[in-house]
């Protein structure tokens, strides 16, 4: 997860800053959270708009995630955990999503699943 350029991804859980607005970036199949496009998006957004944070994470079997099997339910769990983190730890009032490809598919499933509260 990445909240801004100044907070390394391994320290994000230890931070105490809150943000009114959080953008969750969900990448496509075969990609990962640290692509140049994601980094550029996060840097540009957080430098232009104050009180915004960007969270990027890896789906199962992608990037730094060590899992060997990809499943849609597990992806839904990952997204739910990230949304919950944005709401509780970062105290986000507004949560936005920037998605590509597979990430957009999971996000749309997340939004229409009745058992999961939408962003």
Language model segments and positions:
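Conserved hydrolase catalytic core segment
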Residues: 109-119
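Short, surface-exposed "cap/lid" segments of acyl-processing enzymes
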Residues: 15-59
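Gly/Ala-rich beta-loop-alpha elbow adjacent to hydrolase catalytic centers
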Residues: 99-107
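Alpha/beta-hydrolase active-site loop
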Residues: 69-90
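N-terminal cap/lid segment of alpha/beta-hydrolase-fold proteins
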Residues: 1-18
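Conserved catalytic-core motifs of eukaryotic protein kinase domains, centered on the activation segment
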Residues: 35-36, 65-69
